[in-house]
Regions:
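Non-catalytic alpha-helical scaffolds and adjoining flexible linkers that form interface surfaces
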Residues: 1-249
């Protein structure tokens, strides 16, 4: 038998395996993302019950099976975030947050800041309605934790402050472009309004945001494009999130 470990983890995904078992993707504070084989999880309600549902915070006992796979020996719910599960908009946001986390990080690389940020965001959803700017904050925090933080205070190309003139955001170059460098933007570059740039800077500093629906839609599109450039694809949960967007408070 391999090494054993006791971890605090969020369930990112749970996939049925055969008629009796499941493979779960966990994001742990101590060891980062890992896959665990839950023997008998489907055939016995007594063994794991509802513990392995996505975006559940649990304490897990695991045994290394070899390669990148662990065996899940026992698990107990630390926080189930049950309140958010009765609201479609909050489910959509939580699903997006866990999929974004799963896609941004590599296996077995601890990201304590991202883990704490994910748990904090799930707690926000559990305690109140889904708010668009809370999700924008989580996106920025997730990008920062993964080493992909967009440049918002200095031009992504020349490093100088963007100034007060018209600015563009180029996800391929990694952030905002000043007026002088705006012409170097690629196909995905787009204008970014002063209000949205200020709002995103405030979120990046950890401050609050006062902005309207128009600014929110622009910020969503800009960060969405940034994430898609880094991942090379559009997340499945983002499509669901866009469908329920009008339901967000």
């Amino acid at each position: 038998m391999g090494r054993s470990a006791k971890l605090l983890a969020v369930v990112l995904r749970s996939v049925d395996y055969g008629e009796r078992d499941r493979v779960v993707t966990l994001f742990s504070r101590e060891r980062g993302k890992l896959s665990a084989f839950a023997r008998g999880a489907r055939s016995s309600r007594r063994r794991f019950g509802g513990v392995l549902e996505p975006f559940t915070l649990l304490s897990a006992e695991l045994t290394e099976r070899g390669g990148d796979l662990w065996g899940l020996e026992d698990a107990a719910v630390e926080r189930g975030f049950g309140n958010l599960r009765g609201d479609l908009a909050r489910i959509a946001c939580a699903s997006y947050a866990v999929e974004l986390t799963r896609e941004l990080v590599r296996d077995a690389e601890p990201h304590e800041d991202l883990f704490d940020g994910l748990v904090a965001y799930l707690a926000l959803l559990d305690e109140g309605p889904a708010r668009p700017w809370d999700l924008r904050r989580f996106e920025l925090d997730a990008l920062r934790a993964a080493g992909l933080q967009p440049s918002l205070t200095g031009c992504a190309r020349c490093g100088l402050p963007p100034g007060d003139g018209p600015a563009r955001f180029d996800p391929l170059q990694g952030g905002v472009l000043c007026t002088a460098c705006g012409s170097t933007g690629g196909v995905g570059a787009r204008p970014i309004s002063a209000a949205v740039l200020q709002a995103l800077r405030s979120l990046q500093r950890g401050d609050g945001v006062e902005a309207g629906a128009g600014e929110g839609a622009e910020a969503r599109a800009i960060l969405g494009a940034c994430i898609e450039i880094h991942l090379g694809k559009r997340l499945q949960s983002r499509r669901f999130l866009d469908e329920v967007g009008p339901m967000l408070s």
